[in-house]
């Protein structure tokens, strides 16, 4: 049986650093929200079988998303943290039979709306059949400094450092097990949860265009990238 590829987009955050009057995933860029741009990436990709968006139970914007993408599952069972939101989404996929333990879950930040299709293809091709899973990442190009009290305390050796991106691809069963701990403190992405099990996920070459909309000034770059597509 063919292993399914299921995109899971945690979208329960409030995006406080972005400073808008609504969660950043619902900020409009052009005629669509950031989240709609992100969903479209997966809906257009032939290797993705299903897209699921997990939002907060109090979300008042999700109905528009469901109307725009009636085939997408939009669930209001998000948690207080990203890890909780992903855990809830994976658990429901397994519970209702939309995913088996052996299917691939591709967890992607709602605010990464410029993911190139070729980067997504590369991740699926290189990590889709790997039991340890894998993530998109790019090597660090800039010099990194460690700071104390607003002053440089050290220069960090960057040779072996990579910047994690999303999607992060793991088997549903593995991801469910990795996120099953009651205390998810320190889990900043899915790979870090899997690493705690002693597993070493693959690094797949990402793309600099796959940036995360975090600060207000990022919106300018995102607009340029989306207009260039």
From Swiss-Prot:
Phylogenetic lineage: Bacteria, Pseudomonadati, Pseudomonadota, Betaproteobacteria, Neisseriales
Positions MEP for the nucleophilic attack (site feature) positions: 158, 212
Family the entry assigns: Belongs to the IspD/TarI cytidylyltransferase family. IspD subfamily.
UniProt KW keywords: Isoprene biosynthesis, Nucleotidyltransferase, Transferase
Physiological role: Catalyzes the formation of 4-diphosphocytidyl-2-C-methyl-D-erythritol from CTP and 2-C-methyl-D-erythritol 4-phosphate (MEP).
Superkingdom of the source species: Bacteria
Known EC number: 2.7.7.60
PROSITE patterns reported in the protein's UniProt record: ISPD (PS01295)
SUPFAM superfamilies in alphabetical order: Nucleotide-diphospho-sugar transferases
Disulfide bridge map: none
Pathway(s) per entry: Isoprenoid biosynthesis; isopentenyl diphosphate biosynthesis via DXP pathway; isopentenyl diphosphate from 1-deoxy-D-xylulose 5-phosphate: step 2/6
GO MF annotations, alphabetized: 2-C-methyl-D-erythritol 4-phosphate cytidylyltransferase activity
InterPro entries (alphabetical): IspD, IspD/TarI, IspD/TarI_cytidylyltransf_bact, ISPD_synthase_CS, Nucleotide-diphossugar_trans
Name of the protein in its database record: 2-C-methyl-D-erythritol 4-phosphate cytidylyltransferase
GO biological process, one term: isopentenyl diphosphate biosynthetic process, methylerythritol 4-phosphate pathway
Residues marked Transition state stabilizer (site): 17, 24
């Amino acid at each position: 049986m063919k292993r399914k590829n299921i995109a899971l987009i945690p979208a329960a955050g409030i995006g406080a650093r972005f400073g808008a009057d609504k969660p950043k995933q619902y900020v409009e860029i052009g005629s669509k929200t950031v989240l709609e741009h992100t969903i479209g990436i997966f809906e257009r990709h032939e290797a993705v079988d299903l897209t699921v968006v997990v939002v907060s139970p109090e979300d008042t914007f999700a109905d528009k998303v469901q109307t725009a993408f009636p085939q997408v599952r939009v669930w209001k069972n998000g948690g207080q943290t990203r890890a909780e939101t992903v855990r809830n989404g994976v658990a429901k996929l397994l519970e209702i039979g939309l995913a088996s333990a052996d299917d691939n879950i591709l967890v992607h930040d709602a605010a990464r709306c410029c993911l190139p299709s070729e980067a997504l293809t590369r991740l699926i091709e290189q990590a889709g059949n790997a039991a340890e899973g894998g993530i998109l990442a790019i090597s660090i190009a800039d010099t990194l400094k460690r700071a104390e009290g607003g002053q440089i305390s050290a220069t960090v050796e960057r040779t072996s450092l990579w910047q994690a991106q999303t999607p992060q691809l793991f088997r549903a069963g593995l991801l469910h097990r990795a996120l099953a701990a009651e205390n998810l403190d320190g889990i900043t992405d899915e790979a870090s949860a899997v690493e705690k099990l002693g597993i070493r996920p693959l690094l797949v070459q990402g793309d600099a265009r796959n940036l995360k909309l975090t600060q207000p000034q990022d919106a300018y770059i995102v607009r340029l990238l989306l207009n260039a597509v």
